[in-house]
Amino acid sequence: MLPADKTMNNDMLYHTHTLTNGIRLLYVPVESPVVYCGFVVNAGTRDELADEHGMAHFVEHMLFKGTERRKSWQVISRLESVGGQIDAFTTKEETYVYTTIPAQHLERAMELLADIVFHSTFPEHELEHERGVVLEEIQSYNDSPAELIYDEFDNLLFGDTALGHKILGTEKTLQNTTSMRMRQFVQRCYTTDNIVFYLLGNVRGDKLVRLAERYFGVPPTKRTFRRVPPETYRPTTQRSNKDTYQTHCMIGNRAYHQLHDDRFALLLLNNILGGPNMSSRLNMSVRERHGWAYTVESTLTLYVDTGVWSVYVGCDNSHERDCLRLIHRELCDLASHCVSPRALAKAKCQLEGQMLIADENRENMILTMAKAYLQTGHCLSNDEVHEALQAVTADKLRQVAADIFDKRQLSTLIFN
């Protein structure tokens, strides 16, 4: 067995091991007939060069289109033939390739995952076909202003930098992508010291290590490419005519990075303001009291060296000013006044409960753990999260709100 590193969610243990080539293993043993496993690669949109917009996402698509020993249909059918599933997605900082598989077919899954991550060939004829698929994916986003506004707001916050670029890229950059450029991107970013393989399931740790050594034994490689830190932020207001039935508004600011001392205070603050609960301040004010919007929410994304906090609302054109006024009023109130002790205790209890419920989705839980281990080398336990949240004071919440919700630092994007 691998040595236990830490008590994790729901009192489970997680274990880690590093292969001789630098690939890290994260293992959570649970009683289940199903195994969740996959690779998370520390390579995403922000690792693209100036002429590679959309490359990380396009590579993710092409991983399923053929390897040195498999055609695309063989990749797809290898796990589906035994009832398994394989999928992938790309973020600004990571690429995930993952499977859900009956436990008895774990070796089949690990061999296939290794084949597509380490031995994909990116055939030209498949590239031309998949280019059309990704272009249609871009068009589907363009037809959804409630999704598109998040991408364009990132561009407002980070400008013409990798963090400001759309994950899907653009039609122009996709047309310029070649198989050779894809292989160069993978060679630069998919290095063994840049990869975590994770597994949650009823598998012995020594078996996992043995299979990993058998199938992941590629030569060691090291990442030499360094991410460019975000440029100086300048708040901006922008209005764009999208010919929509509704007005779509987004207000926000750059936020803290994922290891910032005040990240738990901001997480709690965001949940109070516009988290996924009907009792959030924004939902009660904008939707329940006035009926001016169907969707009003705030979101928080933490990156390795920065973050994004934002509020989104979709409303009738006639209610745009009213909604923005109510949002700013809530922001000002949180930045100017301390929440009551009772409200603070309720907010902490609510957030911890939401986290516990979210952990019942085992796939989401292990994906979250894998990202944390990849980026920080550590997975927080429930006890650590509880202690961090309990340490947040009402005055700390107000200080963080005054910092992040500072009206002089807010950017605004409006589609109408």
Language model features: what each stretch is:
Residues 2, 18, 74-223, 229, ...:
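Charge-rich, well-structured scaffold segments of protease-associated domains
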Residues 8-34:
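N- or domain-start disorder-to-order transition segments that initiate the globular core
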Residues 22, 29-79, 153, 251, ...:
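Active/ligand-binding-proximal structured segments within catalytic/core domains
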Residues 30-33, 91, 244-245, 406:
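Short strand-connecting beta-turns/loops that link adjacent beta-strands
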Residues 232-233:
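Self-splicing inteins and homing endonuclease
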Residues 236:
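Flexible, small-/acidic-enriched active-site or ligand-binding loops
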Residues 244-252:
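Acidic, glycine-rich loop-and-beta core segments that form the ion-binding/anion-interacting portion
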